[in-house]
From Swiss-Prot:
Domain of life: Bacteria
Membrane topology listed for this record: Single-pass membrane protein
Function in brief: Part of the twin-arginine translocation (Tat) system that transports large folded proteins containing a characteristic twin-arginine motif in their signal peptide across membranes. TatA could form the protein-conducting channel of the Tat system.
Cellular component terms (Gene Ontology): TAT protein transport complex
GO BP term (any one): protein transport by the Tat complex
Residue spans crossing the bilayer: 1-21
Name assigned to this protein: Sec-independent protein translocase protein TatA
Compartment annotation: Cell inner membrane
Family assignment from sequence similarity: Belongs to the TatA/E family.
Length: 69
């Protein structure tokens, strides 16, 4: 995960704890989780749209070549 070891992650978590306090951590984690969920949803939608366009292109080329023969 980004080349970070266990000690580095613990240090980062301690710094976050000091900066935001224990009361804000659940709120921050919830916001981060929602953001990641939205990002993954958008990524999936883009992949599905891309795949549908790629799948349509050979069909159009196939029907065009069969009508020309």
């Amino acid at each position: 995960m980004f080349g970070l070891g266990g000690q580095e992650l613990i240090l980062i978590l301690l710094i976050i704890l000091l900066l935001f306090g224990a009361k804000k951590l659940p709120e921050l984690a919830r916001g981060l989780g929602k953001g990641m969920k939205e990002f993954k949803k958008a990524q999936t939608e883009i992949e599905e749209e891309f795949n549908s366009v790629v799948d349509e292109k050979p069909k159009k080329e196939k029907t065009a070549s069969s009508t020309q023969s």
